[in-house]
Amino acid sequence: MSNTLHRLPDQLRPNLRLVFVGTAASTRSAELGHYYAHPGNRFWRAIHEAGITPRRYQPGEFAALIELGIGFTDLSKTGAGMDHQIAAETIDVPGFRAKMEKYRPRTIAFTSKKTASLFYGMPSAAIALGRQARDGSWPEIFVLPSPSGAASGSWTLEPWRELAAWIKSRAD
């Protein structure tokens, strides 16, 4: 099966209040065509419990979040699987940067330290969770613990709550 079949559609438009960025679609997400679709993934519960969304959405409802000012993309639009299974050549940081410059979201949230490490070009161990130092004209950037069930040892909701508080403090 071609990796291009695994692509999830970007959910982007100008001036979103928040864009969630993953490394690549999980195998399950790629099969279903929905972000964070694996039953063990905590994403949908986390964004609700943290106060980012007014209710708990289901993976198949991801497109509805654009009406809340929330978008989605991945650094690899053609790879699928767990982070360690994603081929390096499918990671497109320049393409991601171009999308963010085009759409100018207010806040970017990487949904794992691995994703942030690929963006920043530094080891995951060197990246702290939470709000990152401001980088010039770039939007605010948060790094969240991976909601994947495979990353349960490092799970905490606190950075997600920090993100929710930040978003609410900047509401129009």
Regions inferred by a protein language model and the residue ranges of each:
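Internal catalytic-core helix/loop-beta-alpha segment
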Residues: 67-124
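Short, surface-exposed acidic-centric catalytic microdomains
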Residues: 28-88
